[in-house]
A protein has these predicted regions:
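ATP-binding pocket architecture of kinase catalytic cores
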Residues: 1-51, 58, 62-73
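An alpha-helical support segment within catalytic cores of ATP-dependent transferases
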Residues: 42-97, 107, 156
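ATP/Mg2+ or Mg2+-diphosphate-binding catalytic cores
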Residues: 63, 69-72, 175-207
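Pre-DFG segment of protein kinase catalytic domains
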Residues: 94, 112-115
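Hydrophobic residue at the +6 position relative to the catalytic HRD Asp in the kinase catalytic loop
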Residues: 102-104
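Active-site activation/catalytic loop segments of kinase-like enzymes and analogous catalytic loops
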Residues: 125-154, 167-185, 197
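Start-of-helix signal in alpha-solenoid helical-repeat scaffolds, especially tetratricopeptide repeats
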Residues: 160, 164-168
Length: 207
């Protein structure tokens, strides 16, 4: 552990790179790796509850922060998706929760998923949503990721569920960004992009 910056390297992976979102083979390999991990149906004794986290973050930054003029309306829309998610969610298993492309290390013959601090029991489709929103994918590229992950299970119901997760998760990261801003760290650009995604995918979830 580096005492100056807190960085810890437990094992250095030679000749590895993070998932390149411009390389479809990288994206395919990482998404299929994620699906394979979920299919193991691993269980732990703690869960990641998306809406519980939203409430927690709201409590830390103020229920109705004023970063955006229509934030109250947007919040109501995001909260209204909870019932849709509850009625459609798939069987929980151990999920990474933060499977962003930076956390996939790709080698010639192997893939490694790092940074498990948020992991817990959840709907595996939430992991797919998290992958897409961090990369700030447009709908066409998002649908391609969903297609790769779902394979033979691909259906409109699962797509709508992933869109709902994307909307709610984006709102969660808006709150996270606001908390960071209140502590003196500027994530405004990221916060704005996540806010736009939350509004956009709320609409897709209802179509």
């Amino acid at each position: 552990i580096n005492p100056d910056n807190g960085i810890k390297i437990s094992k250095y992976l030679e000749e590895s790179h993070v998932c390149n979102m411009e390389n479809e083979e990288d994206v395919k390999a990482c998404i299929r790796y994620l699906r394979k991990f979920h299919d193991m149906k691993l269980e732990v004794n703690h869960a990641f509850d998306l809406y519980a986290e939203i409430r927690l973050y709201e409590g830390q930054c103020g229920m109705y922060f004023d970063a955006f003029p229509d934030v109250r309306e947007t919040r109501e829309k995001i909260m209204s998706l909870r019932e849709l998610i509850k009625n459609r969610q798939t069987q929980n298993c151990l999920c990474h929760i933060d499977p962003v492309y930076d956390n996939f290390l790709v080698q010639k013959d192997a893939i490694h998923l790092i940074d498990w601090e948020y992991s817990g029991m959840s709907d595996p489709l939430l992991d797919v949503a998290m992958f897409c929103i961090y990369a700030n994918l447009d709908k066409e590229k998002t649908d391609r990721v969903i297609e790769i992950y779902l394979e033979e299970r691909d259906c409109k119901e699962y797509r709508m569920l992933i869109y709902a997760y994307m909307a709610a998760s984006s709102y969660l990261w808006v709150l996270w960004s606001e908390i960071k801003w209140l502590s003196g760290v500027d994530f405004r650009e990221y916060e704005e992009s996540q806010y736009m995604l939350a509004k956009e995918y709320y609409q897709y979830a209802l179509d």
